[in-house]
């Protein structure tokens, strides 16, 4: 195959290696055509023509030809070394580790062709670096050797100027003062190293610290001991006055925030420290899928005056984590009812029970949430917080929840004042976990508790009046298209103020058909929230949505 090419001129020789891939290509094509080498297409004759090779630039042909290659353009690129590195190279390559200025110039030009041009510029920089850097020491010339100019050498302390001998990385600018200080420090270290007892005292302070540590360390241990005592010896909840109930709720918030176990400020005061709360969260979320809803804790009629205490929550969390959610909501409902009956301002009640909750509201929805909190009880803020707590609900959903609250307000005129006050939303920050689990339950014990009758308080008065409506609403929306309105339905029962109704006429028309379907639903008389949804069905498609938990109330 090679014999077919004419090798008369060296230029054509330079082109032949360039065709290495195309030779095999054309050879395979000719063999496939069945014509053998005689059927070579025209391009081969073009490439083998010596006159055609002359069209290539001379430099390219010479690069492949037998001539000695000229300096490549890459040789004209400036080397990545600083002038200090270049001078150091020249000095270290000298036989006596000292070299004259002209010797430095010659070494640089021999090693790097880039510096063969523009000598005046870079040689001036070399002189500046020699005189300005303390690492280069000028040695006077002795008279024995002919020539002129002093020698330049490196300071003995500057040999470690470059990291690992690489001239590309210099540690820092060498200074004589720093070198002297380093020497002194090394001498001190050498003096301190021989006596080993000198190193023993440092371990002593940790022992002393351990001796003193029982002061700061016991509080977590004592707190846990108290929890276990409360868990093993549950004390009955003591009825308190409304003001005392609110005081205990707010007082319980302070040690939790200060306790070392509490690391998140977004937990409401009703939440236990994270040390024991995670044991309740996954159990109540995952257990709600497979296990039937647990029976509700008994809610006696004097539950309205019952105070919310840490003992209550700790015993419930220790006893049965699944029923802890319902008892948590009932305890919060009691304290919320107490605060609303005591006539305390709703923002105060909301702030006392959810200290870090205001930071969860998105800025566009702040007006709606503030209006709801000042509207009546904590219900408005509860509805707004339920919509905006996770940061994924928009203002229109808050409007829907407030509309639903205003629409449902008429059914609750006989209910105790603001029984479902801010309790609908208070447990929600504890359970509004960012990942969407497959359970279609988890917050229905709270939303449904407040919606279906204030978590046991209203259930005593209207066991089936509103509960069935909530259940039918929730079941009608099980298709998933309007599943995001479950929070609105949960907040619907909690508000006792129809004043918000006038602001949402357009939204009301949207839900008119749904409202008519609710009253005629066969599930109306059902007083429980037993819903069996498939575990794979997810109510929410957003990332930080609420998940709903079913439990009896």
UniProtKB/Swiss-Prot annotation:
Effect recorded for residue 86 to E: Decreased nuclear localization. No effect on DNA-binding activity. Decreased transcriptional activity
Sites where Phosphoserine occurs are at 235, 241, 272, 320, 521
Which GO MF term does the entry hold, naming one? sequence-specific DNA binding
Name the consequence of residue 79 to K: Decreased nuclear localization. No effect on DNA-binding activity. Decreased transcriptional activity
Q: Has the keyword NAD been applied to this entry?
A: no
Give the recorded effect for residue 86 to F. In RIEG3; no change in location at the nucleus; decreased transcription regulatory region DNA binding; decreased sequence-specific DNA binding transcription factor activity
- Tissue specificity as recorded in UniProt: Expressed in keratinocytes of epidermis and hair follicle. Expressed strongly in microvascular invasion (MVI) formation, basal-like breast cancer (BLBC) and hepatocellular tumors. Expressed in breast cancers (at protein level). Expressed in hematopoietic cells.
Q: Where is the composition biased (Pro residues)?
A: 194-206, 291-303
Please give the record's induction comment: Up-regulated during the progression of epidermal keratinocyte differentiation (at protein level). Up-regulated upon calcium-mediated keratinocyte differentiation. Up-regulated by transforming growth factor TGFB1.
The segments labelled Required for transcriptional inhibition in the record are 215-366
What segments bear the compositional bias annotation Polar residues? Answer: 356-368
Pfam families tied to this protein: Forkhead
**According to the UniProt record, what happens if one changes residue 87 to A/E/K?**
Loss of protein stability
Which effect does the record note for changing residue 165 to R? In RIEG3; no change in location at the nucleus; no effect on transcription regulatory region DNA binding; decreased sequence-specific DNA binding transcription factor activity
Q: What does this protein's UniProt record list under function?
A: DNA-binding transcriptional factor that plays a role in a broad range of cellular and developmental processes such as eye, bones, cardiovascular, kidney and skin development. Acts either as a transcriptional activator or repressor. Binds to the consensus binding site 5'-[G/C][A/T]AAA[T/C]AA[A/C]-3' in promoter of target genes. Upon DNA-binding, promotes DNA bending. Acts as a transcriptional coactivator. Stimulates Indian hedgehog (Ihh)-induced target gene expression mediated by the transcription factor GLI2, and hence regulates endochondral ossification.
Instruction: From the record heading the sequence, give the disease linked to this protein.
Output: Axenfeld-Rieger syndrome 3: An autosomal dominant disorder of morphogenesis that results in abnormal development of the anterior segment of the eye, and results in blindness from glaucoma in approximately 50% of affected individuals. Features include posterior corneal embryotoxon, prominent Schwalbe line and iris adhesion to the Schwalbe line, hypertelorism, hypodontia, sensorineural deafness, redundant periumbilical skin, and cardiovascular defects such as patent ductus arteriosus and atrial septal defect. When associated with tooth anomalies, the disorder is known as Rieger syndrome.
Assembly and oligomerization: Monomer. Interacts with C1QBP. Interacts (via N-terminus) with GLI2 (via C-terminal internal region); this interaction is direct and increases GLI2 DNA-binding and transcriptional activity through a smoothened (SMO)-independent Hedgehog (Hh) signaling pathway. Interacts (via C-terminus domain) with PITX2 isoform 3 (via homeobox domain). Interacts with FLNA and PBX1.
Q: What is this protein called?
A: Forkhead box protein C1
Organism of origin: Homo sapiens (Human)
